[in-house]
Amino acid sequence: MPTDSIRDAAFCDVLNRELVCALGCTEPIAVAYAAALASQTLGCEPDHMDVACSGNIIKNVKSVTVPNSGGMHGIEAAAVLGAVGGDAKSALEVLESVDDKDRARVSELLADAGYCDVSLVEGVPNLYIKVTATAGGHTAIVEITDHHTNVTCHTLDGIPVCGKSAGECAACAERVVAERAADNADTPMSIETIIDFIEYGDIEDARAAVERQIELNGAISAEGLAHAWGAEVGRTLLGARADDVACRARARAAAGSDARMNGCALPVAIVCGSGNQGITCALPVMEYAEYLRCDHERLVRAVMLSDLIAVHIKSYIGALSAFCGAICAACGAGAAITWLCGGTREQIGATVSNTLGNVGGIVCDGAKASCAAKISAAVDAAILGHDMAMQGRGFRAGEGLIQDTVEQTIASMGYVGRVGMKDTDIEILNIMIGKTQVC
């Protein structure tokens, strides 16, 4: 058994790794980051760019608005904007410094149909980006794999920029992941261990990250409610039933996504590599904490509970799949709401199982305006799951994917998302890119 200090350090490390800031949807931002790094390596604006991506990257970049772009969409826009005006040192906030001059130059370059070529790469990890940029007879290559800022290849004219071979760079990145996994292996994550940490643990090392999540994600939610972004899902909900805490919880989460999916330049704290999931983990919990008049310390611990449960569930699915990640985040939010309301550990677990038994398996068909509606639906299911659990009700083991314990249910749903939905993911992409004609 790990000591409390080992457990606390491991979970604080998870929170600090997860809760990084990103400006806009993380997939186009990752493309922009790779392009900015390639341009920086060349030392000038590229003469030509090739961007090769996995299907999931193409799916998630196709329809979402690239932040600070003036309303542009797509991989070409993200890559060229990153190359022209991005600051690679800012990582997932790479486009924060883009100005009107940059946007005008990007429009000029995109008018040349041959300036930036995009291709689909098969047989690679779900999160894969390779940018090849050329200028003045030189070629810079940046490859990102598995995580949005995980650079596994960075070369100039075939010579590794990091001072190691491309294979060594990739091996180094893999070794860091393996070391992190080993560091946390003695502290297995489960609903029980997460609650132990939240109720009794020393959270100080992760407090600043969660405080920033509450501040940033609260700000983009307020922006989404104050102004017309996207399909205005949050404003629609708030206009219909503002006197209902459950509806307000859905509205605040959806509003953050309304703004983020449609080009709002405000940064967010991400969870599981996703700003939408970072928003979904935090906003419903913030609304219920305010409604219940909880003190700030209890709010911080509740948001941590939400984040960690989302990470725990998502770990069974992996980065980017056909399984909508907002479901994982909503499970976390629902569990945190149950905790705020004084629910037992059994009721917290039942909230998660009830939510997965309801909306587990909603498909991801790319980042776009309707993500806000999926977040609303997921949070609605989580609140129903919470209400059922608090009244001693729930779905029985053996019904669908519901198992004897919440951990077994999480594992079964994760298997479906990771393995069972692989073909679903392919068919969704084929329809989106026009490869499959259904009528």
Q: How does the language model describe each region?
A:
Residues 39, 67, 288-301, 311-377, ...:
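Hydrophobic alpha-helical bundle architecture
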Residues 111-263, 429-439:
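Signature of multi-pass transmembrane helix bundles
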Residues 243, 247, 260-293:
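Membrane-embedded translocation segments of transport machinery
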